[in-house]
Amino acid sequence: DGSSNAIPGHSLPLATLGVFILWLGWFGFNPGSTMAAVPSIAHIAMTTNMAAAVGAIAAMVTSWVMFKKSDISMALNGALAGLVAITAPCAFVSAVSSFWIGLVAGVLVVLSVLFFDKVLGIDDPVGAISVHGICGTWGTLSLGLFAQDVFSPGTTYSCSSGGVMSRTPPTSDATKGTPLAIASSKTCGN
């Protein structure tokens, strides 16, 4: 009849174990991507953990508010959503920013699972489109919104470090005339 039928999880303990194994593995993925034993590894691990934990809590609270009951599978997807969202900006954002990135990812994953299921009628039993597509996009955008120079001096054009609105655009001969230099010079008023 065209309606989607939810398939209940067969083993929430195994699903939870799987998410915790992924969560642990993400500590090799995000901090391990620095390819060197540098002090920023601890910061990257902290932002990764913060976003995942807040994503799980945000998804749990959102599902509780919307469905009048907690949904463990949504909380697990919230943790994964936080991990996916923090992957791009993990080295460039503060702990407070990672909190907000995880919070938005946790809420987004619940809303987008419902959107794909109810509105579009797309059969996505584990919420992979929502976790990886929607929250991955959010994480990429959040890099531009929350990156701070203190974590990587001279490399960011983000809103929280003044952004393109207060930054002098690139002026080296290599960047003159490029779309970025032209756009940022117009945005910055130079």
Put a short name on every predicted segment.
Residues 1-169, 181-184, 188-190:
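Glycine- and aromatic-enriched membrane alpha-helices
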Residues 170-175:
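Low-complexity, glycine/proline/serine-enriched flexible coil segments
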